[in-house]
């Protein structure tokens, strides 16, 4: 089935009114209302109880409902990443040439109040139906240019062991070198999901990358650290991603502590994201000028091992954009006539390099 045929089928199905297929077209107001219930996992509640002062508040702010969520700004929309234009099926997004995104479920262990798929998560759609999974497998087999698949949702690890293993075996049947990225918040929200059986299975399914979403050093309790160490010890590469959130982790000290701790655990800090323009998330958004200033300081304090890529998903489907390009503008001067550029060095002096 071609992408065009899949897209036409998706539009037809939307007309049938299946809730789990039309969330991207919801109004911003409906997404920002009280639709996304407050839901906190026992493991995360335990982390909150263990944390002190500002750390406890930072964790609570991520999962506890606040009235500010009802405020919708003009720039916000239900589908801030513009995924709708790239949908092959309602559960598969093919935005980049060599990789696709699969929504395996609409369920999460906890509800992040800044979620950019809050309309989808609010519907709490269950595990992807078998017929939808088979359409994805068919598409992957017909599209050999796809070398990676991001398995996301929701959180894929909310599925049963049988569901997860069946899905991963189906994906692995496509090609032995298809890279599977497991995008999950379970490391912090539900570390018990990483059983020895699951880790052994993921080893069997290599190449598999674990992509945990971790925002604050207080999310790295002893159990969470043990999970990451177990994954790394089993030979599973782990690359984290974090979202910059006002009142949670928008300080140099907090982020330096987090990224250094992850690196010590063998986890590569992958991305630090500027917040997406999802409805009702404005209170979490750090002004871009502050973000760039913060990252410049992080760059001075952290090595390449510990420093993540600063990025934003451009609204409307423009894809990931490295904000490093903006952060370093003031540190670079181009000399076209001299066929060279000058850059500010670590000592503050300017140095010239020829084209």
Swiss-Prot record:
The keyword Flavoprotein does not apply. It is an enzyme of class 5 (isomerase). Its cofactor is [4Fe-4S] cluster; pyridoxal 5'-phosphate. The modification N6-(pyridoxal phosphate)lysine is found at residue 320. It comes from the Bacteria. The keyword Metal-binding applies. This is Putative L-lysine 2,3-aminomutase. It comes from Treponema pallidum (strain Nichols).
